[in-house]
């Protein structure tokens, strides 16, 4: 019976700040999690999703019997790409009526499909590069990490399976059928199942995995390339190194540097209240890894002090707090790899040049050195009365556009836009060098909603002075808010929250008859 049904694997990818272009619903008297309202030209349409499809798996995890809120959360936490296994509506209803085990429905077909797939050519016929391996840090809850280990006949290595929905492994970014490359920094590609189980058991309450998903593993196999651990994605780790830029005050930087008796390297101590070090976000017990882009892990105390002095009136430190240091030590990864990864917007921590004026209206004061102030914002605007509630301005002869005349209580105000905000991206496309008319056209052609990456004037001047590219990953992620496609635009309890809490990446609507979420 199961062989008569043909589930489809749909892979969706989107840009930062955009949505997938579909609604995920549950409906009264209807089984399953339904795909609805697929937007024309959206990632959902391009991936082959159809109206009425039922979602069986998300990133390999079976979700048909899960609560709708958990299914929505799985999609949201997938970031900018997600793989859905779906079954068309008619087939789903027949399968349910005939009591077909939906969990087993796709197994043989998925394996056959995977074996048949070949890597597609990229631009100009070039082979697409393989994705990165990734580090996942798991801290046990109760007595479980929320996964099982398996071997596959005819394949080398150990794989992760039975990923528990909302369990430790899933929250850490583990996917079903991930190939296990390292356990706590030790390669296990040639280890037996029993040896890997022993290493996991001996890890105690926390463990670090270097993993490769099945698509990436197949890509490397077909291209006959090997994994490079130094290229691993670090973005899933809960604690990261920090880049701290400090400008010397009249009394110096305002901290002491000491050799830690139990900690390798030099650590920050006795930060003075109100000092430049405190304002820049430096913390007591931070471990110094690099100074002005150069590693100091092998230097003694005097060597690190000299490196800081050479910075003159400003220095840039790469530091780790105790949690981040513990995680990177467990993985046996150098924190300097963080600077080389795509997750760090500026890519390096070299000493910045002298401040230069921003292309837009120059400010009369130095940019603040408060690290928390140096963040762009992602703002998702839902049009009301055919207006977004702000004006777009530019200075003749200069690149860039900025926000003016934000209407109080309007869509722009609700989304967190402020006067003088500089427009960096429109729907994921960088527009800093685009002419004013082109930026206006992009916003107008967005339809009912638009996602803007913006930066306040002071923060913009800071990034320009440091030659730091402004990208969406630097901003706080968009959070769920009121329904963008609901039947009414009346204010809800969300409207009492601060502006940044109202910015939207997804929208939801619920009633006694249905519950749906725009993805």
Swiss-Prot record:
Span of domain PDZ: 9-90, 128-215, 243-323, 378-458
Main localisation: membrane
Region (Disordered) location: 348-374, 479-519
PROSITE patterns in the record: PDZ
Compartment(s) of residence: Membrane; Cell membrane
The keyword Transport is assigned to this record: no
Keywords on record: Cell membrane, Membrane, Phosphoprotein, Repeat
SMART domains in the record: PDZ (SM00228)
Pfam families linked: PDZ
Regions of compositional bias (Basic and acidic residues) in chain numbering: 482-503
A single GO cellular-component term on record: brush border membrane
Domain of life (superkingdom): Eukaryota
Membrane-topology descriptor: Peripheral membrane protein
Positions of post-translational Phosphoserine modification: 108, 148, 192, 250, 334, 348, 489, 492, 508, 510-512, 514
Coiled coil segments of this chain: none
Amino acid composition bias (Low complexity), ranges on this chain: 505-519
Subunit relationships: Interacts with PDZK1IP1 and ABCC2. Binds to the C-terminal region of SLC26A3. Interacts (via C-terminal PDZ domain) with SLC26A6 (via C-terminal domain). Interacts (via C-terminal PDZ domain) with SLC9A3 (via C-terminal domain). Component of a complex, composed of PDZK1, SYNGAP1, KLHL17 and NMDA receptors. Interacts (via PDZ1 domain) directly with KLHL17; the interaction is important for integrity of actin cytoskeleton structures in neurons. Forms a heterodimeric complex with NHERF1. Interacts with AKAP2, BCR, CFTR, SLCO1A1, SLC22A12, SLC22A4, SLC22A5, SLC26A6, NHERF2 and SLC17A1.
Membership in a protein family: Belongs to the NHER family.
Protein name: Na(+)/H(+) exchange regulatory cofactor NHE-RF3
């Amino acid at each position: 019976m199961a062989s008569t049904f043909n589930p489809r694997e749909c892979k969706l990818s989107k840009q930062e700040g955009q949505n997938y272009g579909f609604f995920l619903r549950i409906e009264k008297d209807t089984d399953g999690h339904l795909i609805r309202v697929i937007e024309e030209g959206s990632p959902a349409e391009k991936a082959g999703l159809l109206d009425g499809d039922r979602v069986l798996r998300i990133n390999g995890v079976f979700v048909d019997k899960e609560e709708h809120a958990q299914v929505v959360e799985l999609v949201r936490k997938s970031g900018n790409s997600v793989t859905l296994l779906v079954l068309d509506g008619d087939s789903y209803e027949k399968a349910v009526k005939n009591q077909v085990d939906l969990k087993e429905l796709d197994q043989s077909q998925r394996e056959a499909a995977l074996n048949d797939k070949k890597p597609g050519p990229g631009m100009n016929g070039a082979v697409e590069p393989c994705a990165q391996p990734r580090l996942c840090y798991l801290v046990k809850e109760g007595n479980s990490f929320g996964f099982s280990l398996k071997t596959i006949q005819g394949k080398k290595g150990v794989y992760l399976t039975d990923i528990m929905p909302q369990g430790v492994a899933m929250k850490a970014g583990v996917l079903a059928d991930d190939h296990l490359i390292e356990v706590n920094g030790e390669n296990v590609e040639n280890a037996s199942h029993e040896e890997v189980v022993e290493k996991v058991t001996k890890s105690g309450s926390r463990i670090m995995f270097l993993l490769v998903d099945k698509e990436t593993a197949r890509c490397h196999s077909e291209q006959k390339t090997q994994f490079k651990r130094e290229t691993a994605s670090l973005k899933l780790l809960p604690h990261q190194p920090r880049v701290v830029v400090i400008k010397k005050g009249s009394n110096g930087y305002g901290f002491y540097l000491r050799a830690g008796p139990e900690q390798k390297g030099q650590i920050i101590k006795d930060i003075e209240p109100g000092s430049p070090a405190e304002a820049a976000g430096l913390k007591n017990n931070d471990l110094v890894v690099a100074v002005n882009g150069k590693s100091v892990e092998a230097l003694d105390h005097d060597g690190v002090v000299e490196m800081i002095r050479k910075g003159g009136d400003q220095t840039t430190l790469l530091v780790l707090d105790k949690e981040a240091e513990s995680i990177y030590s467990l993985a046996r990864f150098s924190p300097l790899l963080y600077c080389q990864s795509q997750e760090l917007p500026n890519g390096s921590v070299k000493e910045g040049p002298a401040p230069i004026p921003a292309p837009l209206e120059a400010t009369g004061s130095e940019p603040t050195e408060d690290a928390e102030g140096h963040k762009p914002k992602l703002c998702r605007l839902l049009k009301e009365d055919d207006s977004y509630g702000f004006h777009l301005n530019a200075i003749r002869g200069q690149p860039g556009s900025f926000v003016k005349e934000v209407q109080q209580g309007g869509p722009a105000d609700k989304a967190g836009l402020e006067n003088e905000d500089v427009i960096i991206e429109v729907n994921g496309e960088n527009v800093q060098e685009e002419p004013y008319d082109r930026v206006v056209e992009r916003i107008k052609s967005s339809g009912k909603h638009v996602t803007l990456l913006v930066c306040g004037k002071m923060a913009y001047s800071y990034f320009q002075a440091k030659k730091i590219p402004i990208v969406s990953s630097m901003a706080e992620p968009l959070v769920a808010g009121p329904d963008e496609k609901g039947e009414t635009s009346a204010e809800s309890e969300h409207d009492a929250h601060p502006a940044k809490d109202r910015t939207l990446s997804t929208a939801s609507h619920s009633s006694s008859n249905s519950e749906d979420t725009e993805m």
